[in-house]
UniProtKB/Swiss-Prot annotation:
Organismal lineage: Bacteria, Bacillati, Bacillota, Bacilli, Bacillales
Key word Cell inner membrane present: no
GO biological process: defense response to bacterium; killing of cells of another organism
Pfam families listed in its UniProt record: Antimicrobial18
Source organism of the structure: Staphylococcus epidermidis
Annotated keywords: Antibiotic, Antimicrobial, Bacteriocin, Lantibiotic, Plasmid, Thioether bond
Protein name: Lantibiotic Pep5
Cross-link annotation Lanthionine (Ser-Cys), location: S35-C39, S52-C59
Originating gene: pepA
Cross-link named Beta-methyllanthionine (Thr-Cys), sites: T50-C53
Residue numbers of 2,3-didehydrobutyrine PTMs: T42, T46
Described purpose of this protein according to its UniProt entry: Lanthionine-containing peptide antibiotic (lantibiotic) active on Gram-positive bacteria. The bactericidal activity of lantibiotics is based on depolarization of energized bacterial cytoplasmic membranes, initiated by the formation of aqueous transmembrane pores.
Length: 60
């Protein structure tokens, strides 16, 4: 049973290090750029809504 537990612990450590290695090189800039590219339609609609809101209601 001790051998099985040690192998299980090693697998957890391996997965944790892999996840960390994948996430560390990324910065907020590329992630934001990618999300903007995926959501351009939503962003355009939001901008139009904001402009129309300011024009009609005088929202601050």
């Amino acid at each position: 049973m001790k051998n099985n537990k040690n192998l299980f612990d090693l697998e957890i450590k391996k997965e944790t290090s892999q996840n960390t290695d994948e996430l560390e090189p990324q910065t907020a800039g590329p992630a934001i750029r990618a999300s903007v590219k995926q959501c351009q339609k939503t962003l355009k609609a939001t901008r139009l809504f904001t402009v129309s809101c300011k024009g009609k209601n005088g929202c601050k």
